[in-house]
Amino acid sequence: RDESNGEVKLTIYPGGVAGDESAVIRKMRIGQLNAASLSTSGLSYIVPEFAAITHIPLLYNSDKEKDYVREQLSPELIQKLEAKGYIFIHWGEVGWVRYFAQSPVKVPDDLKQHKLFIWADEGTDIQMYKTLGMNPVPLAATDLTVALQTSMVTAFSTPPLIALGNQWFAGAKHMTDVKWAPLMGATIMQKKVWDQIPPKIQELILTASKKAEIELTEEIRELDDKAVEVMSEHGLVAHKVTDEEYAEWEAIVNTVYPYIRGKLVPEEAFDKVVQLRDDFRANHLSK
């Protein structure tokens, strides 16, 4: 709004006011909403390949690996998004997903003893976790606090910032210090609405959005670790794992990769991100 001197008006519906991501997408399709910030899970309802960036556990060891894969995949994702009638505005991220539980979780067998919260609208994950021998409990995120208090749920996974912001860690004070996967998303807009905005203002919006993306990404990455420090001051115990324990997580993930490849992530996209990750590691290690 500021960049356009009021020519573009923006009304924001924060914190799930407009419904969950599937509801937001439905509202965009019928024109009730013009734009949205969605996680890669939400974006994958529109372009399934978005899931490849974040839905493969233990794919990345660092932000650099993740950034490389995302940068290489972005042009294709943006093109597919536009073909579906949406314009890509900017990326966003919330940090690295970790497991939080009411007792220490150092290896997968520890997690199998817990009742694990999963998002109610991600039905495909239920079968995946059951295949791994876990006990998934699908719920709305708004029910998680009470579920933890009553032990209906005893473990969940989320980035530290969200665990802190929602105070969920108060009900599960043991964090497994393994970066399971990044939580990321993007802001998109209906193309037919975007096309109504004058080109000069489109350019201003994209420039401002890119600047915000860079600044917020840097800030979020600092706050990801800071959130763990703050929670630790209020009773959280962060459990580091040994190389042997980490190998157990890798082993269980490898058993579920065939399920993820094809069911959660399109096969071609799955293979592509793994290859991109491997290429980055080979080039990085060779220098």
Predicted features by range, described:
Residues 1-65, 73-74, 79-287:
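N-terminal secretory/targeting leader peptides
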